[in-house]
Amino acid sequence: MMGFEWGFKPSSKITQSTVSSQGTGNVMIPTAGVKQKRRYANEEQEEEELPRNKNVMKYGGVSKRRPQPGSLIRGQPLPLLRGMELMNKNQYRQLLVDLMTKHPEIQQSVHTRVIGLDFSIQKCLDMLKQKSEAVYQSIPYNRSYESNKLDDYAFVRMKPQILEFLNCLVDFILDNIPPRLENLHASLKFLDICTELVIKLPRFELASNNYYYDKCIEQLSHVWCTLIEHVARDRIILLADNSSVWKSHMTRLQVYNEHSNGLLERPLQLFKSLDMGSPSAASSSTLSLQESIIYHHDTMTANENNNNSGSAATDSPFN
């Protein structure tokens, strides 16, 4: 009894079937064994061609079409608004400077938008304190600023930070006095703090290295006199406000004058001429103050003429 046969037929049977086919007039009579041989031969051929197919996956045996380059997702830069959200302050500023340099026609438009913004006094003070700290951090590590005897080497290292601070201070002061700011109390308070920041800056042993400090204090003296002139002309402030407010400013100004070797003497005298006691006293003090202001303006003009005739530093922020 023959069982289930797997694979090829034995060679003897294949030979017998071949002989029998030759004896029947060269007519090939297919047998079951030949059919199975073809089927198994085709299966072996498929098994040999299977590893050659590069598109067959290693795991799972599922073929995959090679992706074309056009169907791949390509990276792209951020949109303009999304990129601007990630930019910091320095990058914004550099971008604006580069744009205004390449396109000068947009400078006026940018300036108009900037001056239309309302910056708080506290924000200005925070910026000034940061720039003041930069001055202290630029002091050489082997020198102490408390002695106020910094040498020439320290001046060379600190000069860029000093000029940046003083330039920023002057710009902020001019933006916070009349007519830009009508609140005289806020203007005086801001000027008071700015004067204190300048007075406390470390000074140098050589007097010529303190030129920028002294020049700045002279300009602050002119601003003090200008604000006192506005106060003298405003009768409501003279009569309604508490005299202790003005005395507080005068006391602090006196301390600043002592530390600046008398450079703030003129506004101090103008403050002392104010009398808040009565309307008649206020009126008389206003007249005497106006006479002092006329003398102040004449003195300021003479000093400016002397400064223009002499040689001054080209990088001074106050020339």
Curated annotation (Swiss-Prot):
Coiled coil: none annotated. GO terms for cellular component: cytoplasm; nuclear membrane. InterPro entries: Cut8/Sts1_fam, Cut8/Sts1_sf. It is found in: Cytoplasm; Nucleus. Residues 34-74 are annotated as: Disordered. The keyword Protein transport applies. GO terms for molecular function: proteasome binding. It holds the Pfam family Cut8. GO terms for biological process: nuclear protein quality control by the ubiquitin-proteasome system; proteasome localization; protein transport. Keywords: Cytoplasm, Nucleus, Protein transport, Transport. It comes from the Eukaryota. The keyword Cell membrane does not apply. Involved in ubiquitin-mediated protein degradation. Regulatory factor in the ubiquitin/proteasome pathway that controls the turnover of proteasome substrates. Targets proteasomes to the nucleus and facilitates the degradation of nuclear proteins. Belongs to the cut8/STS1 family. Binds the proteasome. Interacts with karyopherin SRP1 and Proteasome subunit RPN11. This is Tethering factor for nuclear proteasome STS1. It comes from Saccharomyces cerevisiae (strain YJM789).
